[in-house]
């Protein structure tokens, strides 16, 4: 069951050199540049809004993963990648080493660890 709308086909050549984990690759193939049907997530008692998944195609004009990665590079550790955003300019990050999802608050510059990637996807899909 696809829990996303308005997604774009992923050009696998765009991401072949990123060494992304298999679980994340499977997710991004389905959710590239899409908006989740369930956009309000409750994680550890706090609400987060997922507006859309970033577009991982190199040629993307809007919500381009590569532009976000460059823009946020000074704030991220080497294993963190941006993969989604909310409606307010904040960004969800994934540590591809630990598979922990974090939240970057653009107003404060703070990064908070939220939850492991599998649990994040379960909540996003309405299964938790």
Regions found by a protein language model. Give the residues of each.
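A surface-exposed partner-binding patch
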Residues: 1-92
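Functionally constrained cores in energy, signaling, and assembly domains
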Residues: 16-18, 80, 102, 116, ...
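Solvent-exposed, non-transmembrane amphipathic alpha-helical segments
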Residues: 44-48, 103, 114, 121
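Short, compact, well-ordered microdomains
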Residues: 90-91, 95-111
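Compact, glycine/acidic-enriched structural inserts
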Residues: 107-128
